[in-house]
Amino acid sequence: MDRPSVVTIGVFDGVHVGHQALIRHNLQIAQRFDLESVVVTFEPNPLEVLRPDDAPTRLCELSRRVELIAGLGVELVEVVEFDADLASQTAQEFAQAVLLDRLDARHVVIGHGFRFGNRARGTAETLREAGLTVDEYSLLGDVEPVSSTRIRAAVAAGDVVEAAAMLGRPHEIAG
C-alpha cells in the first residue's frame, strides 16, 4: 500500500445500486483525506462455507464482481478467501489482521447494520475500538432497502425491469 486506506467491506453480490452508493462514498472519503480507496470482498460468499444448504444463488461470479467494483474507480479490490479459519476469527482479529495490518486502514465505510467476525459479533463499535473512523452509510432504496435478496427474488419472478432498476444495469447471466 502506498498510503493509508479507506476500506469498504462486503460480499457485494451483484454490485447493486446500494453497493455502488457505498463504494462511491468510499471514493469521496479517499479523495477528501488522500487515502487509498479499497473494497474488501469475500470468495466464496461466507454463506457457502457457513451454511452451504442455505447459500443463495450468485448474481454474478467473482471475476464480474471485481470488474464492476473496479469500474467504479476503486484503487484496490482485495479478495479475501473465506474459509473455516477466517470464519473462526473474532471481529477484533479480522480488524487487526486484514484492515490494520494488511490494508493500513484508517477509515471504514459500512452499510447500516453491518456485522463481521466469528458469529457476526463485530459491529461498527468494534471497528471504532480498533482505532478506525467509521461511516455507517444507509443503503435505502425506494421503500425497502435494495438488497441482493430482493434482486434474486425479482429475477426468479421474471421481473427483469425491477432487477435492472436495483442493479443499475440489466441483469446478466454468464454461462
Task: List the predicted regions and their residue ranges.
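Nucleotidyltransferase catalytic core that binds NTPs
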Residues: 1-175
